[in-house]
UniProtKB/Swiss-Prot annotation:
This is Elongation factor Tu. Monomer. Residues 174-176 are annotated as: G5. It is found in: Cytoplasm. It comes from Mannheimia succiniciproducens (strain KCTC 0769BP / MBEL55E).
Length: 394
């Protein structure tokens, strides 16, 4: 029993495989679980168990994803693998599987291909912080110079999208041979695991980040003042803390004079908890759903941003027709809808259901946001798209 308890104290890190179709992402995923379970314990997963990915719904979007888990001596990894290219696009944009780092699989026999580039770009847009490269199928390439050339191409491609191409770990291996148990190739999987352990820093837990609470409801309690409720997204709020009310209106400062949960007064509210926060001197009409309470200076309100968007297909309950420039839907951030206008990239006249597209959005009210914030695009309460803030303009 004590061993089980010990395992749970290991840091949890979320990773995933990305890369071009048929370059060996799923085979590598199977090889990692197999080799690591042999060396460090845990469950091995066969290729076909991973390849028959179950359908999931994230924000109404159908995504096929496989989740596997494995351990190294120092960490516990949750790893996502998607069977199809469209699944990757949806997964990365909706943040259904947030990645602390990604393993980019490139077949040495092909070198970088169109989806290799697209996944790196998406990784940059949606805020995947670290990429490690697994150069696969190296057992099929005898020419050392060719391997060096492919490696150089991959490094250049990463640098093009602002990843540190020159410093990125590249492991040369063969997922298939490792899966078949050949010692020299198994060694490469252990090398990859070591790169994950050392190159991807331990993710900062939500509770250690600056306090943020999306406001869901506002009440006036006679004799006590104004209470806002919501689920603490990150950080800790303590009685007596000064906070800012950010978004929609001018940013205002106030002090939290009480934190309550299930009608009980507490000293603090923590990430993941549903709380009510009593605010000193704030009037009921000065605050509304859609704003956030945040640690002063930790987040700012913005109206204009670049985003990466996936437009739901008709089958997913999305639009049946394309939209054009001048489209004015609602953008749903955290707890509220804000109307916005869009600009499409040069040369793009229309966007079809099922497309993913880069678009510039201009909202009619500012919303508290930072890069990587997810949102939904809605028309009259119906979700027609999902997006992520890639870059703040103003």
């Amino acid at each position: 029993m004590s061993k089980e308890k010990f395992e749970r104290t290991k840091p949890h890190v979320n990773v995933g495989t990305i890369g071009h179709v048929d370059h060996g992402k799923t085979t590598l995923t199977a090889a990692i679980t197999t080799v690591l379970s042999k060396h460090y314990g845990g469950a091995a997963r066969a290729f076909d168990q991973i390849d028959n990915a179950p359908e999931e719904k994230a924000r109404g979007i159908t995504i096929n994803t496989s989740h596997v888990e494995y351990d190294t001596p120092t960490r516990h990894y949750a790893h996502v693998d998607c069977p199809g290219h469209a699944d990757y696009v949806k997964n990365m944009i909706t943040g259904a599987a947030q990645m602390d780092g990604a393993i980019l699989v490139v077949a040495a026999t092909d070198g970088p291909m169109p989806q290799t580039r697209e996944h790196i770009l998406l990784g940059r847009q949606v805020g995947v912080p670290y990429i490690i490269v697994f150069l696969n199928k190296c057992d099929m390439v005898d020419d050392e110079e060719l391997l060096e050339l492919v490696e150089m191409e991959v490094r250049e491609l990463l640098s093009q999208y602002d990843f540190p191409g020159d410093d990125t770990p590249i492991i040369r291996g063969s997922a298939l041979k490792a899966l078949e148990g050949e010692a020299q190739w198994e060694e490469k999987i252990l090398e990859l695991a070591n790169a994950l352990d050392t190159y991807i820093p331990e993710p900062e837990r939500a509770i250690d980040q600056p306090f943020l609470l999306p406001i869901e409801d506002v009440f006036s309690i006679s004799g006590r003042g104004t209470v806002v409720t919501g689920r603490v997204e990150r950080g800790i709020i303590r009685t007596g803390d000064e906070v800012e009310i950010v978004g929609i209106k001018e940013t205002a400062k106030t002090t939290v004079t009480g934190v309550e949960m299930f009608r009980k007064l507490l000293d603090e509210g923590r990430a993941g908890e549903n709380i009510g926060a009593l605010l000193r001197g704030t009037k009921r009409e000065e605050i509304e759903r859609g704003q956030v309470l945040a640690k002063p200076g930790s987040i700012t309100p913005h109206t204009d941003f670049e985003s990466e968007v996936y437009v739901l297909s008709k089958e997913e309950g999305g639009r049946h027709t394309p939209f054009f420039k001048g489209y004015r839907p609602q953008f749903y951030f955290r707890t509220t809808d804000v109307t916005g206008t869009i600009e499409l990239p040069e040369g793009v006249e229309m966007v079809m259901p099922g497309d993913n597209i880069k678009m510039t959005v201009s909202l009619i009210h500012p919303i508290a946001m930072d890069q990587g914030l997810r949102f939904a695009i809605r028309e009259g309460g119906r979700t027609v798209g999902a997006g992520v803030v890639a870059k703040i303009i103003k």
